């Protein structure tokens, strides 16, 4: 993961921890349990919305390194040659398919972001970022989000790309203290998908008209 993109003011650094980092930063050895929780985004991992979006775009394109740019208008064209991040794309395909299933199968955590139009299938994954350590009392009380003090509520996350067969868009959503990613962030993503589809159709019609006029 890139530490910074340097395209926004006050952008924070990201962190994907490893054994060397922990030894240098904390003076302690890495333990197996940290490998397990790191795999699901817990532990010492730190990330920003732009980093999540960039990660999602690189999953969508099959694992090629890309750099975000702010485009002022539709006339700006970039023809960068992207560098592969990985030698094999098999694992990328597994992640792509899993994100598609999460969004388009009824039992998927991202199903609330699914569009009904079969022409536009997106692939996404929800996330819930824990804010406060869960105590034994918390487990016994089993409080709902609205019963928890606002500043202690989890952050709701969602990332996605699409359309699935020919990806053009990637997005990331973080709702601070929003609660569950599937309950809060995924429905918001659906509204964004609708806006993307509308814009996509408008642009497609514009391009077709432009070519007809030539």
Segments and roles (model prediction):
Residues 179-180:
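Short beta-strands and strand-coil junctions in structured, solvent-facing domains, enriched
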Residues 3-172, 213-214:
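Beta-lactam-recognizing serine transpeptidase/beta-lactamase-like catalytic domain environment
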Residues 76-81, 190-214:
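Short, gly/Ser/Thr-rich active-site loops of penicillin-recognizing serine hydrolases
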Residues 48-54, 184-191:
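Short amphipathic alpha-helical face segments that pack within enzyme cores
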Residues 64-65, 183-186, 195-200:
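Glycine-rich loops and low-complexity Gly/Arg-rich segments
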């Amino acid at each position: 993961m890139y530490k910074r993109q340097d395209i926004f003011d006050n952008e924070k650094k990201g962190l994907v921890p490893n054994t060397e980092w922990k030894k240098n930063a904390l003076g302690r050895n890495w333990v197996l349990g940290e490998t397990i929780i790191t795999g699901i985004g817990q532990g010492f991992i730190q990330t920003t919305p732009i980093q999540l979006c960039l990660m999602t775009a690189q999953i969508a394109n099959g694992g090629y390194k890309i750099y975000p740019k702010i485009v002022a208008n539709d006339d700006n064209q970039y023809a960068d040659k992207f560098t592969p991040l990985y030698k094999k794309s098999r694992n990328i395909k597994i992640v792509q398919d899993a994100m598609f299933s999460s969004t388009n199968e009824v039992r998927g955590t991202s199903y609330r972001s699914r569009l009904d139009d079969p022409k536009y299938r997106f692939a996404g994954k929800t996330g819930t970022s824990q804010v406060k350590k869960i105590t034994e009392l918390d487990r016994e009380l089993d409080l709902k989000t609205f019963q928890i003090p606002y500043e202690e509520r989890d952050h709701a996350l969602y990332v996605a790309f699409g359309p699935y067969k020919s990806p053009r868009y990637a997005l990331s959503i973080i709702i601070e203290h929003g609660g569950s990613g599937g309950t809060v962030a995924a429905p918001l993503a659906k509204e964004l998908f609708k806006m993307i589809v509308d814009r996509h159709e408008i642009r497609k019609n514009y391009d077709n008209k432009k070519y007809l006029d030539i």
